[in-house]
Amino acid sequence: MDLVKGAAKVARAMVACMAMLACMGIVPAHAQRVDPDIRVLRALLEKAEPEIDLARAKLVIDQLIDPTIDIEGTLAKLDVMAAAVRASAGPRAKSSEIAQVLRSYLYDAGPWNNRQPFRFDLEGDPLGHKIAGKLLTNYLATKKGNCVSMPTLFVLLAQRLGLEATFAASPNHYFVKYRDETGRWYNLETTSGGHPRRDESYQRDTPMTPQALKNGIYMRPLSKKESVATVMVDVLLDHYKDAGKPEKVIAIADLALEHYPSDIDAMLDKGYAYYLLIRDFQNKYPMPRDIPPEERQRFRALERNNRLWYEKAEALGWREPDAGADARYMEMLKSVKSN
């Protein structure tokens, strides 16, 4: 009986100790309650590359933002779209011919789409700031997209058609990388009808450092796992930034970086999350001298982490956009849309 009481006392002490450590942020990951979103994302990211279904991954992540999303129904809709492209291309079509039919199916007006093609939302949300505009189901419903939703649909359909297509990034922008039957890679700009664009064009319109190119954070085709970690998870990170949940942002960014260590978006989101925590601290204590002694260590840790993650991004070649970056980006989008 004394042993049972002793064990119970030890257990209570351990629980109290773990609670204290949790408050300090140093509880081992396995000892903490696993956040449901983290559990879902980890299951996706721990799949072997050939087992990753990008369409399902996208919808599972989007459903964390909008629980009303019908995953199976949307997958069935994608299958119907892919079947229509395959039938139009014919049984003996080469990869490049199927890609051209897919491009026309999505972006040219015709009876196959009731003369309502998918188009870039130049007037409504051209910079892709609205979370809803990045959800696949919203894009399918409205046919108005941005540089997240538009390449996403193209890649998901291309992969269902057996084409070698994936995502690539330039600063604040995603596009499609496609390799044809000859082994040649093309950049396809879905915001302007899926037409090819040269590397030099992206490097001119969305400037990137030689260091960034050397480190592969821009312009290269992403693996499926990298695509999930950055293109798809980044929408969830934006959702939690908008919701004012920086701790959640940090936890999700950590998971993304675990599987894609060069994920610039996750680094920047993590740095921004620490800024939000610093801002909350400063709202509570307007002057540094107002911070109680027992909380100063945490405040300094927040400042260090805020600097750390921006410095990590800069070390890979990322640079802070200047004041005119958004205006130049808009001009680029208008230019490619008119070509």
Feature annotation, model-predicted:
Residues 30-339:
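A structural boundary/capping signal
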Residues 2, 19-20, 40:
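Acidic/proline-rich low-complexity IDRs
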Residues 13-25:
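Bacterial N-terminal signal peptides
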Residues 1-10:
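N-terminal secretory signal peptides that target proteins for export/translocation
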